[in-house]
From Swiss-Prot:
A single GO molecular function term of this UniProt record: UDP-N-acetyl-D-glucosamine:N-acetylmuramoyl-L-alanyl-D-glutamyl-meso-2,6-diaminopimelyl-D-alanyl-D-alanine-diphosphoundecaprenol 4-beta-N-acetylglucosaminlytransferase activity
Cellular compartments per GO CC: plasma membrane
Recorded superkingdom: Bacteria
Membrane topology according to the record: Peripheral membrane protein
Keyword line: Cell cycle, Cell division, Cell inner membrane, Cell membrane, Cell shape, Cell wall biogenesis/degradation, Glycosyltransferase, Membrane, Peptidoglycan synthesis, Transferase
InterPro entries recorded: GlcNAc_MurG, Glyco_trans_28_C, GlycoTrans_28_N
Binding site for UDP-N-acetyl-alpha-D-glucosamine: T15, G16, G17, N127, R163, S191, I242, A261, L262, T263, V264, S265, E266, Q286
Name of the molecule in the record: UDP-N-acetylglucosamine--N-acetylmuramyl-(pentapeptide) pyrophosphoryl-undecaprenol N-acetylglucosamine transferase
The species this protein was found in: Pasteurella multocida (strain Pm70)
CDD domains: GT28_MurG (cd03785)
Role played: Cell wall formation. Catalyzes the transfer of a GlcNAc subunit on undecaprenyl-pyrophosphoryl-MurNAc-pentapeptide (lipid intermediate I) to form undecaprenyl-pyrophosphoryl-MurNAc-(pentapeptide)GlcNAc (lipid intermediate II).
Cited Pfam families: Glyco_tran_28_C, Glyco_transf_28
Reaction equation(s) it catalyzes: di-trans,octa-cis-undecaprenyl diphospho-N-acetyl-alpha-D-muramoyl-L-alanyl-D-glutamyl-meso-2,6-diaminopimeloyl-D-alanyl-D-alanine + UDP-N-acetyl-alpha-D-glucosamine = di-trans,octa-cis-undecaprenyl diphospho-[N-acetyl-alpha-D-glucosaminyl-(1->4)]-N-acetyl-alpha-D-muramoyl-L-alanyl-D-glutamyl-meso-2,6-diaminopimeloyl-D-alanyl-D-alanine + UDP + H(+)
């Protein structure tokens, strides 16, 4: 009789920063013969994204409380209790050998339900500062892993699992060899587009159009509006989305973008210099993510409050290709190519203990 397949329940949802690293770990374990099931919510991005990667998904009902009215806050205990019961039912039916929490609202009830069922919980924090759910779950998790060394004082640093295609790009030395002409600037606003970048970059290009070639990802529905802001004869390509981020990063001499955890880890994986404009948040999550590469000499940080076309022109004109190549090499040195493998190894270790 063949040995029974090991089963992993993955809890991750809400944003690509949680979901994509979790998919990377899930796919690695699938290649090792594991069975994977996903716990998510039906109204967030994981509902469409996860099945496309051939991973079955189950849903519970839970949402965040930030910015909600008094009625939602008063009903929160009932909503959380209901979500725990829903997660417990799924866990009882699936009987996983381990549960991986990668963040998002779904991880809270799922983690509690797993603990109640006696299933080992392995937690991974993608950001440089832990979110509320993960801060609480860390108290009941069997193992806590982190991408950056600042989220938890005693957790193992493993990096962020990212797509392997990012690591297979040519090295910075290979990419920069023989490059001439205008500096290649990639502007990435994310799935929503970063309005502040969409408004600022056209003015930068107006001042430096003879020195820059720009690819600008503006987000859904913004192409027409942003196109009208750019000078007519500038070397600019504008798109809603970029399907192949690995190739786009590799094309660029420098990337201007937000500093979500996944973006920072992807830039390190490829080895690309960056100008980060962190999203303003009270816990400084994106600023601390950006600092990881900035402290290594691989990036510059411009706080959003200080971002003007003049400031960006000043920063860009300080760079030449030799400087940007050295920054890219430093970024590559901060990459963690074995992150997905290491998270998977910890899951296997804990599953084998029970």
């Amino acid at each position: 009789m063949s040995e029974q397949k090991k089963r992993l329940l993955v809890m991750a949802g809400g944003t690509g920063g949680h979901v994509f690293p979790a998919i990377a770990v899930a796919q690695y374990l699938q290649q090792q013969g594991w069975d994977i099931c996903w716990l998510g919510t039906a109204d967030r991005m994981e509902a469409q994204l996860v099945p496309k990667h051939h991973i079955p998904i189950q849903f519970i009902q839970i949402s965040g409380l930030r910015g909600k009215g008094i009625k939602a806050l008063l009903s929160a205990p009932f909503s959380i209790f209901r979500a725990i019961l829903q997660a417990r039912k799924i866990i009882k039916a699936y009987q996983p050998h381990a549960v991986l929490g990668m963040g998002g609202y779904v991880s809270g009830p799922g983690g509690i339900a797993a603990k109640l069922c006696g299933i080992p919980v392995i937690l991974h924090e993608q950001n440089a500062v832990a979110g509320l759910t993960n801060s609480w779950l860390a108290k009941i998790a069997r193992r806590v892993l982190q991408a950056f060394p600042t989220a938890f004082p005693n957790a193992e640093v493993v990096g962020n699992p990212v797509r392997q295609t990012l690591f297979s790009q040519p090295t910075p030395e290979q990419r920069f060899a023989g490059r001439e002409g205008k500096l290649r600037v990639l502007v990435v606003g994310g799935s929503q587009g970063a309005r502040v970048l969409n408004q600022t970059l056209p003015n930068v290009v107006a001042q430096l159009s003879d020195k820059l070639e720009v690819r600008h990802q503006v987000g859904q529905g913004a192409v027409e509006q942003v196109t009208t802001l750019y000078p007519e004869h500038a070397s600019v390509t504008i798109t809603e989305f970029i399907d192949n981020m690995a190739d786009a990063y590799a094309w660029a001499d420098i990337v201007i973008c937000r500093s979500g955890a996944l973006t920072v880890s992807e830039l390190a994986a490829v080895g690309a210099a960056a100008i980060f404009v962190p999203f303003q948040h009270k816990d400084q999550q994106q600023y601390l993510n950006a600092k990881y590469l900035a402290d290594a000499g691989a990036a510059t940080i411009i706080p959003q409050a200080e971002l003007t076309a003049e400031k960006l022109v000043s920063v860009l004109t300080q760079f030449d290709r030799e400087t940007l190549q050295q920054m890219a090499i430093k970024a590559k040195a901060m990459a963690t190519p074995l992150a997905a493998q290491r998270v998977a190894e910890v899951i296997i270790e804990e599953a084998n203990q029970d």
